[in-house]
Amino acid sequence: MEQPKGVDWTVIILTCQYKDSVQVFQRELEVRQKREQIPAGTLLLAVEDPEKRVGSGGATLNALLVAAEHLSARAGFTVVTSDVLHSAWILILHMGRDFPFDDCGRAFTCLPVENPEAPVEALVCNLDCLLDIMTYRLGPGSPPGVWVCSTDMLLSVPANPGISWDSFRGARVIALPGSPAYAQNHGVYLTDPQGLVLDIYYQGTEAEIQRCVRPDGRVPLVSGVVFFSVETAERLLATHVSPPLDACTYLGLDSGARPVQLSLFFDILHCMAENVTREDFLVGRPPELGQGDADVAGYLQSARAQLWRELRDQPLTMAYVSSGSYSYMTSSASEFLLSLTLPGAPGAQIVHSQVEEQQLLAAGSSVVSCLLEGPVQLGPGSVLQHCHLQGPIHIGAGCLVTGLDTAHSKALHGRELRDLVLQGHHTRLHGSPGHAFTLVGRLDSWERQGAGTYLNVPWSEFFKRTGVRAWDLWDPETLPAEYCLPSARLFPVLHPSRELGPQDLLWMLDHQEDGGEALRAWRASWRLSWEQLQPCLDRAATLASRRDLFFRQALHKARHVLEARQDLSLRPLIWAAVREGCPGPLLATLDQVAAGAGDPGVAARALACVADVLGCMAEGRGGLRSGPAANPEWMRPFSYLECGDLAAGVEALAQERDKWLSRPALLVRAARHYEGAGQILIRQAVMSAQHFVSTEQVELPGPGQWVVAECPARVDFSGGWSDTPPLAYELGGAVLGLAVRVDGRRPIGARARRIPEPELWLAVGPRQDEMTVKIVCRCLADLRDYCQPHAPGALLKAAFICAGIVHVHSELQLSEQLLRTFGGGFELHTWSELPHGSGLGTSSILAGTALAALQRAAGRVVGTEALIHAVLHLEQVLTTGGGWQDQVGGLMPGIKVGRSRAQLPLKVEVEEVTVPEGFVQKLNDHLLLVYTGKTRLARNLLQDVLRSWYARLPAVVQNAHSLVRQTEECAEGFRQGSLPLLGQCLTSYWEQKKLMAPGCEPLTVRRMMDVLAPHVHGQSLAGAGGGGFLYLLTKEPQQKEALEAVLAKTEGLGNYSIHLVEVDTQGLSLKLLGTEASTCCPFP
């Protein structure tokens, strides 16, 4: 499904509080731009807050200044000018404060969500969800201006929230519904019936909250999202040059101004609320400031006075999204676990993870970006993220475990965790990288002082159980009433003699029976509190290790998808590997799968995936993906594949590939050769159809006696493409086809006879001699181009080889072979009265007639079903590929369904469709062919379809299943004798063909179909489309002249013609005629 049009952001800014994280988060924004989550032209900026406690308002003002500076510079100005805001859509995202459950903050907390329609596979963070909401849901339709969005909440917004921007000015807040009880700990808006904001309450009284209740019984919560019009943004930007608000920006800080802390909602926006008076506003304090000294209050009052002067006359309105939802990400582990799990779910959520024993994951648990090897048991309501674990491990209910690797698994063996939060952290202490671990209880409070808990028990009980003392954790002067979890020096970060692991904290869960050894080791370690640990976290290493683990599990997934033959697309994963700069490990994995595959289908798909990786690495440059694949440099690996040595072939391909990686043009050519290698394996799979080719020896016709084979054309009514290898044996194919005469004639034929000369005389073309191409093969060298489809007579040469008359690699000369077995040579003519690229199956049916005539001339009879498989074999020898529907349609009489199962060897079975009496004549009266005048170019269409199938693009896989399913429905339409039902089948069949091969409907054909639409039940181009014949089921009988008149009135249709068509009930016919002189001799 196509993504709706979103906001084309001019600038996206991500604010963060740590200077050393700016570059890290800048890269994260750039990665998202490469993934196409952010428009290519958007300016991306990660901006450090000028001071750690600058507040959401100060961070907004600083970010707005930085955006204006960059846009001013880009526009060629030498000073900041607010004019640049007039045509800009700016998005400011605030990272906010530290989060106890993710080292990279609430923005980069991973959610148990997968986006199956994303072009690039990736973990979904809260930031990604908010970007999507802002770009595609809240942002569209807004005028130029500045959107500001916190990242400390989980939001859900419907696809069309119904926000009107008519006559908008000022600022607009987005509110989402919540219960009055939830609002007691949050912000809530009071508005008038028109949506004008009257006041904003934070942790309001019951009476205040009741005033905000809407008719639905809910209250509009402060959601953390606000929009400033250009005018309001200019007013806000103007404050950055005046004290004390200049201290909110990096310019003020660089000038030595004293920092000031401002709230976006309770300072900047609050002054715009209608009911707020100047006096109340000036003495108020934002909730994030807390209680402080009078000096701070006076400084803040001055800042608020300035905001009042600039912004008071700007209207503040609210957009209430009644069907959305809002959840603030608190420091409660219980609430966090609840937000990441589905308590009533029937099973576990497994996202971007590979789990060997899924049955050990309890319902209502969640696993994100993990590799779990062996027995890893996970209890209900528990969450595993970014872990590579090796069992046996038992994680009970109510746990959060993140950031552990295989080296840490041993510490968890033989122990059950319950109601705990265990995290591994990347650190950088005095410039040296390291690992630290934190362990807390699910029920522990990060805010409570004094009567708090640790590991879910009161501090006193913890001290008693472990031997830890208060002075181990806090300074001696700290009073018991001041004990709190964030300041407790609990967590070892460095041990004097060994590496640290989870065991350095897990000992605290039990009464000690080791004589105090663990306690002594803990005391001997350098320990930090959670607050002290935050500035030491290495966020670059954290994100790098998450990315590494994501790709490690992705390689396991790729291997499993290929080896288990799953219909999952690896294209998004391929794009991820290429765009994040690590295609090498993926290529190595694909090589391993291809080399070790016992199934040519699995190996061919793996090679097609390699071709996809190379194509993606070219990034749209270097030419078209479809093209020649016969460069001499690649012949050595191809030769290994041809002789069945898959492992050597794959290795040789990889060695050659390494020489073609330096620039896009070479990458594209290498991709073509990998597709060529895949074709070799497809060919070997299809060759298995030879199992079902058998001949019966009969009397040899006399020298000079002609054997004539004639065939109708075929029209496909449903299921085409499903017969094409590899779909035919990977998905299983089903095609309904009709054998048809065109203008009363059977247009395809061949004749063969023995001649005394030990040579092969070949003639190709219509029966009229002046158009015939004549070829004489006197030696084996004359046959060597049998596998080059465009070489003159290639199909006829391949027919001699496939019929076993000539052995092209024999040491015997051609004349010796012919004299020894047949006492002379052969003459073979083939003809078709249909134009090239007709779409009526000409070449495959021609191959069938040529084989039938040749075999009979050589004293053998081939059954029609055997002949169907023989043509499959011949077309692989000829290297044109192709499916089985054409020969089934033309060689077998009447109306029938051909089917092949999802297995090798490839076998085609044919079922005749019985229709009501008189229906064939009725069909003849309503069926017409229109030659469009356009030649179909099926070769590139075929390559594109195979590429899409091997990539298992979801739309193509779904469509392929629909093709097979509809064939059975179409057969039912014939059994009922219902023309309207068959017309519906044709119409939907044409839509399916277009989905399978985009580009198969030329504009002139579309115009012709539009003109004919009112007169027909249904219509479709024959075969793969792109040109050739259009067939129609007319509403009225015998409409040839009427439709000729309709088309004659339409300009620009080109050289078209309308033809009568009737169902042929004979199929392939074979006759022996008398002897006569050759019509094409003397040969040159």
Swiss-Prot record:
One of its GO terms (biological process) is GDP-L-fucose biosynthetic process. Keywords: ATP-binding, Congenital disorder of glycosylation, Disease variant, Kinase, Nucleotide-binding, Transferase. It catalyses: L-fucose + ATP = beta-L-fucose 1-phosphate + ADP + H(+). SUPFAM superfamilies: GHMP Kinase, C-terminal domain, Ribosomal protein S5 domain 2-like. ATP binds at residues 834-845. GO terms for molecular function: ATP binding; fucokinase activity. Transmembrane segments: none annotated. Signal peptide: none annotated. Its EC number is 2.7.1.52. It comes from the Eukaryota. Expressed in fibroblasts. Disulfide bonds: none annotated. Gene3D superfamilies: 3.30.230.120. It holds the Pfam family GHMP_kinases_N. Changing residue 683 to C: In CDGF2; uncertain significance. GO terms for cellular component: cytosol. It is linked to Congenital disorder of glycosylation with defective fucosylation 2: A form of congenital disorder of glycosylation, a genetically heterogeneous group of multisystem disorders caused by a defect in glycoprotein biosynthesis and characterized by under-glycosylated serum glycoproteins. Congenital disorders of glycosylation result in a wide variety of clinical features, such as defects in the nervous system development, psychomotor retardation, dysmorphic features, hypotonia, coagulation disorders, and immunodeficiency. Takes part in the salvage pathway for reutilization of fucose from the degradation of oligosaccharides. Belongs to the GHMP kinase family. This is L-fucose kinase. It comes from Homo sapiens. The gene is FCSK.
